[in-house]
């Protein structure tokens, strides 16, 4: 596939929620977590309202030249006392539309998030990826991320 050379990264809008949820659901893990229904469950829109007004969180989308949403991620800036009071960026929910994968979209949006975290004074950027997502782990390693922690989850 040819690389996508021109994408626009912007804050997500309410009318993007359906496309974002569809991308979140478009893999074996996400398909079991997300509910793609028509209409979309109100819980997604309530969560979007919280994200939209949180000053330390940016939910962004990547648009192609035609204005179609083809990727997304969430960047959280977390202040902390560790590392001498350093803030850290947490990158979450990185997704690229199936038909646009392996075309540079993921790399561009992750690079945007790293630059944004740095511009906001973060000393480091972290992300989590499920241990079964071997391709994603290779992708992040190629971008300079290194395995450093063991993630633990407790679901309610």
Q: What residues fall within each predicted segment?
A:
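A short helix-loop-beta-strand connector motif used in the catalytic cores of GNAT acetyltransferases and
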Residues: 49-61, 90
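Conserved active-site alpha-helix within GNAT-family acetyltransferase domains
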Residues: 107, 131-149, 154
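Conserved GNAT acetyl-CoA-binding A-motif
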Residues: 110, 117-129
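A short beta-loop-alpha structural element at the N-terminal edge
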Residues: 8-22
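Conserved GNAT-fold acetyl-CoA-binding loop/helix
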Residues: 25-47
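A conserved beta-turn-beta hairpin within the catalytic core of GNAT-like acetyltransferases
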Residues: 80-91, 101, 147-148
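Conserved beta-strand in the GNAT
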Residues: 61, 68-77, 90, 95
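Conserved acetyl-CoA-binding loop-helix of GNAT-fold acetyltransferases
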Residues: 93-96, 102-115, 142
């Amino acid at each position: 596939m040819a690389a996508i050379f021109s994408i626009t990264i912007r804050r997500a809008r309410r009318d993007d929620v359906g496309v974002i949820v569809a991308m979140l659901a478009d893999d074996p893990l996400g398909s079991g977590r997300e509910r793609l229904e028509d209409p979309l469950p109100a819980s997604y829109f309530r969560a979007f309202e919280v994200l939209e007004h949180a000053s330390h969180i940016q939910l962004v989308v990547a648009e192609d030249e035609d204005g179609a949403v083809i990727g997304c991620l969430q960047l959280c800036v977390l202040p902390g006392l560790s590392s001498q009071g350093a803030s850290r960026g947490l990158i979450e929910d990185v997704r690229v539309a199936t038909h646009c994968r392996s075309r540079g979209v993921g790399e561009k949006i992750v690079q945007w998030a790293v630059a944004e975290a740095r511009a906001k004074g973060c000393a480091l950027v972290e992300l989590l990826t499920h241990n079964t997502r071997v391709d994603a782990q290779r992708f992040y390693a190629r971008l300079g991320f290194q395995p450093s922690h063991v993630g633990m989850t407790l679901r309610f």
